[in-house]
Amino acid sequence: MDPFEFLECSICSEEVIDFAAIFSSNKKFGDKACKHNFCVSCLTYLMEYNTRNKKALCCPICREEFDGFIQNKTSSDLLKQARKLSSAQIFLKNENSKLNEEINLIKNERENEAIQYRDRIKQLEDSKSKQVQESTNIKSRIKEMENEIQSLEQARLLDLQNNQSKFDTQQQQILTLTQSYRESQSNYNDSNLRANELNNQIQKLYREIEGFKQHAQQQDNYIKDIDSEKQLLQQQLSTIEQSYDRKQSDLLNNTRLKDLQIAKLSDANQQLGTSLSKIEAECEHFKKLYKEIQEDANGGYQKNKNLESAIASLNIELSRSKSVIDSLNTNKRTLEKELEEMKLLYQFGRGTSISSSIAPPTIINTANKITNSSYNLINNSIGYFMGSKNYLNDITKPYKGFKIEEKRGNKTSQIHKVSIGNGCGHFVIKLIPTVSGTNVGNSYSKFIYNSIYSSTLAESEILLFREAMLLYKLNHNNILKLESITKDESSGKYYSVLSPFVPKDLEFILAENSQNFGGLGKISPTTLTFSDIKYIVYQLISVVHYLHTQDLVHRDLKPTSILLFDDYQIKLCSFGNAISVFTNFGNSITQPTYSNPSSYSYLSPEYICSVLDKENHSKLSNEIDWKAFDMWSIGCIFLELIYKKKLFNNLNLDNNNNNNNNNNNNNNNNNNNNNNNNNNNNNNNNNNNNNNNNNNNIESNFNNVNNSQQQQLYSVLNNISTYKESAPKNGNLYFKENHNIIIKSKVERDFNGANLPTDAYNLLCALLSFNPTTRIKANQAAFHKFFKDEPYYIHDSASVSPNKLEDLSSLLTDRNIKQFLKEKCSNLIQV
């Protein structure tokens, strides 16, 4: 049905396109009675016809007279728009109906899926309830077994205590008898006869003791048979997937056999107690004999002495018998420990992977062959008989207990932010990497392979855990603490778990607080005030002083090694190159590695010269004072805090960065800017020429440069030489006395135009002395007068120096790493 049917022309009955509205001069207020619609063409023809025939103008329908008409364009436009909207409405209705049909179809599908999910959830809940019931039954059974073992152990201990008390009483009686026999000197002939009879009885007792030893040997063989049966049980585990029902019954029988074996050991202990009772009876018999001899003997000093020897021999044999009893008890405890290890296997299987290195190695070798489905079957069977027991260890934690929240680094240098539990307690886990250039392996993949398939570390691999040992043993407020060591079983990687988590480092703070104005080297005012710089440097010197008092050197001090809280309290990290000064530095393993060129800016000149001097490298590297090396690095950091930029940087890298910046400006700016950039490039080229001339003077004292690392070190050394007031003419910078490296006026000019305090300038010069023998020591810098007016300054040297009882220097050498792993990580790492 057309919704615009009522708009047809009353004359031609066609659709009205152009509306014509009639009007009458005597009806000016819209009170005309005619309400019909006319199109312009029809009404025009009607008026022309009536006018030509001189007829009155009137509506052909209602005959109402009118004087004329007007063409209503507004009504025509509204009609066109209404028709368009009507078509759109019809189209949208059709689309809406289609969408409703699709929605209903999707809704029906979702309802069907929801029904299926509810059925599946119900099935899972039923299965869960069954498993919970089975677990409850298993736990109750395990509890009963543990109570039974505990009661047997208590009874055994009580019997041993009673036997020991009786034995002590008998020994006292024997001593009393011996004293009585010393007083007896009569009836020598009769006592001789009695003594011979006693010797025969002692020989008989010796034979009984030998039989007892054979019985003990049989017990040892019996225990070995138990071990072989346990190994047979482990071999049977590898085929449990094909014969689940049969193996489940075998496990039940073997476990019961273990209980019977423990019961047999208890019976053996009782038999030993019976044997001990027999020996006590023999002692009572000897006591009676002694009384008879005391009554009848009239002498015989020599025979009495023989009797004393016999009594002493008897005491020795009794002690040996007691040792045999203790040995059997030890074997029993060994069997109980093996039973606990099997319990641990069950407990560990419920919480983490079967191949975890905290499980016993003999069990892991068998369990590594078992598939996941087989392991589920083993859990269901072993779990019925064995409970769980927390494996006591000092610092190792399971890797799955940590939730990784943020990842940083690459394959060989990974640092992750992690949390435990419900997200509380943030820590940092750091990858323990391989040592480049050692016989650990040619690639990291080889190390991972060895870590996954073998929990035993080679001697060279043990050094990888030097940083972990140091962070665990060091105790200072400004050093990160090692909380635990963990292992990712999926990749075989070891991680150090460190605390606390500090979100920022000094390099980030320097980047935040520096701004360059037009390349002029002027530093804008920042939130990092001079008092904040002073506080940071004091903490850094204090923690290095602590390390040096423990005869430990860091060897990698740089802004990224210094973590900062919001109140500028620091935490020192990156102990990968740290080492004891008692170490033999002639070994290549003990030499520091600086793979990142950003570290070159903080290397001391004597170390750079030792690297560049290839002929005397080994000799010079052994003569380096690494404590002075750390103090130079502190001076570089102090100077960078003042300038907000690196001063002893790689000139080649800086120039490349400047040229790249200029090229970018050329592409983005107008011709005027291009001219300015060309001028800057010319200036940079002039500076490069000057630097190259200085570098040639230094390079002439060494061999030719062969690699990019040496080129960068030459550039850093050249930068240091050009910055100081009076540089030596050759590369042996550490053999020459020099003037101050820092020009105070230059520092003050760049330091926001402020006056640098004299004490700060003196400390900078002392830290950045070219001669390491005259460079300030950590204990001197910690009490420098630059810090004396600050509230955190400690005036008493005894308060800063470590307590003598806390001297750790002998515990921080490389030879202690293996002992550290044995004591703290024995269930994770085998050494």
Swiss-Prot record:
GO terms for molecular function: ATP binding; protein serine/threonine kinase activity; zinc ion binding. It comes from the Eukaryota. InterPro entries: CDK (IPR050108), Kinase-like_dom_sf (IPR011009), Prot_kinase_dom (IPR000719), Znf_RING (IPR001841), Znf_RING/FYVE/PHD (IPR013083), Znf_RING_CS (IPR017907). Keywords: ATP-binding, Coiled coil, Metal-binding, Nucleotide-binding, Zinc, Zinc-finger. CDD domains: RING-HC_CeBARD1-like (cd23143). A zinc finger (RING-type) spans 9-63. Residues 83-348 form a coiled coil. Signal peptide: none annotated. Residues 657-703 are annotated as: Disordered. Pfam families: Pkinase. Residues 414-787 form the Protein kinase domain. SUPFAM superfamilies: Protein kinase-like (PK-like) (SSF56112), RING/U-box (SSF57850). The keyword Zinc-finger applies. GO terms for biological process: intracellular signal transduction. GO terms for cellular component: cytoplasm; nucleus. PANTHER family: CELL DIVISION PROTEIN KINASE (PTHR24056). Belongs to the protein kinase superfamily. CMGC Ser/Thr protein kinase family. The protein kinase domain is predicted to be catalytically inactive. This is Probable inactive serine/threonine-protein kinase DDB_G0274613.
